[in-house]
């Protein structure tokens, strides 16, 4: 599709099509430093694809009733918006593309309230996710079927 963070977009697509999902505890995704990759390139408006991809995953989880993970997914979306936005110029932050990214965040925040997804347990899970993603995945999804 020519978007950045297409691997994240693939997650939402795969969730929609999957009949069953398994948690594999080993990290299978290896980052490599490659000249010209999005990891090493200057942040531009195009990096807002990251926000769009995270919103797609959030919405997919919401549509399928996975409300117990919406807080964590919202934090990922919000963090990506803040991270990308902080690297853009003041002029870039006023563009329609940035406004669309902000709208994704607003919709997700509204959905959190509508789904009653902000609970003490969800906030605790999100806090653990923020502190250590490795530890979060180790404890939150261990031995679940």
Where are these regions (language model features)?
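Conserved nucleotide-sugar donor-binding catalytic segment
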Residues: 1-50
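Short glycine/serine- and small hydrophobic-enriched flexible loop segments
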Residues: 16, 56-59, 83-86
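Amphipathic, well-ordered alpha-helical segments in soluble domains
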Residues: 27, 53-56, 80
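Amphipathic alpha-helices of TPR/Sel1-like and other helical repeat/solenoid scaffolds
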Residues: 50-60, 104-109
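Flexible helix-coil transition and linker loops at the boundaries of alpha-helical arrays
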Residues: 62-71
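Membrane-interface aromatic/basic loop that binds lipid-linked glycans or pyrophosphate carriers
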Residues: 63, 90-145
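Amphipathic alpha-helical repeat scaffolds of TPR domains
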Residues: 71-87
